[in-house]
Amino acid sequence: MEDRNNIYFFYKHTKSMQEAVEPLKQLATSQGLNVVDDVQKANIIVSVGGNNAFLQATRKTNFRSDCLYVGVSTDREGFYPDFTINEIDKMFEAFENQNIEVKRLSTLEVTIDDEKPFYCLNECSIRSNVIKTFVLEVFIDDMHFETFRGDGMIVSTPTGSTAYNKSVRGAVVDPRLPSLQVSEIASLNNNTYRTLGTSFLLSGDRTLRLKVVQDGNDFPIIGADNEALSIRHAEDIKIRLSDKQVKVLKLKDNTFWHKVQRNFL
């Protein structure tokens, strides 16, 4: 692993969190690391909180490929954090015992109306801003696949497949499989209107395109991981697996499937 010694702590700046993070900073300093207040100077970014804090940390720091991300949970271990705040010394023990590895997690690249793209680590969701059936023309690469009618769609990465995607009965996907999963939210299926009616996987080299069918009021709400984006006039949405990857510090004996087993079985 390349030398990294500038560490930045990402957390919610409340009094209780500042008190909780201070011992972490002291421990990092005692291990020879430089604690920096400017994230641009960091090559290690530690999120303190939970899965949501980790998603915020990657988004707010623009999914930096030159940094190593570490998740520390304040409650219990999550899918992204491998360490808890009360046992942070175990992280440094793992370093010493070489019981760590760097995982590269895929991100989604989302382009709306050919504007500058944004990225998601878990998923991108598209939903109607009004309580009525939402219509999307669905294209796989250049092929028109279906006309979707329903509440919306979720497009997830493999690591994001255990989140919002799973709540709508999407499949849990091994992160070693470069892919994006497309899942329906309350699709309309009857004798007149049909959709595939199930989630489907696209290989990592394909592009999903969603065209919003407008009737004057159907402007979608775009969800990027745990944030809602205010993009009022989105009409053409392209989603693909990005070349941008997030490098995350993980324990060797705490794999994705260990976490699936603990959380769901």
UniProtKB/Swiss-Prot annotation:
NAD(+) binds at residues 122-123, 149, 151, 162-167, 186, 226. GO terms for molecular function: ATP binding; metal ion binding; NAD binding; NAD+ kinase activity. Its EC number is 2.7.1.23. It catalyses: NAD(+) + ATP = ADP + NADP(+) + H(+). GO terms for cellular component: cytoplasm. It is found in: Cytoplasm. Keywords: ATP-binding, Cytoplasm, Kinase, NAD, NADP, Nucleotide-binding, Transferase. The active site is at 51 (proton acceptor). The keyword Transferase applies. GO terms for biological process: NAD metabolic process; NADP biosynthetic process. Gene3D superfamilies: Probable inorganic polyphosphate/atp-NAD kinase, domain 1, Probable inorganic polyphosphate/atp-NAD kinase, domain 2. Its cofactor is a divalent metal cation. It comes from the Bacteria. Pfam families: NAD_kinase_C. Involved in the regulation of the intracellular balance of NAD and NADP, and is a key enzyme in the biosynthesis of NADP. Catalyzes specifically the phosphorylation on 2'-hydroxyl of the adenosine moiety of NAD to yield NADP. HAMAP family: NAD_kinase. Belongs to the NAD kinase family. This is NAD kinase 2. It comes from Halalkalibacterium halodurans (strain ATCC BAA-125 / DSM 18197 / FERM 7344 / JCM 9153 / C-125).
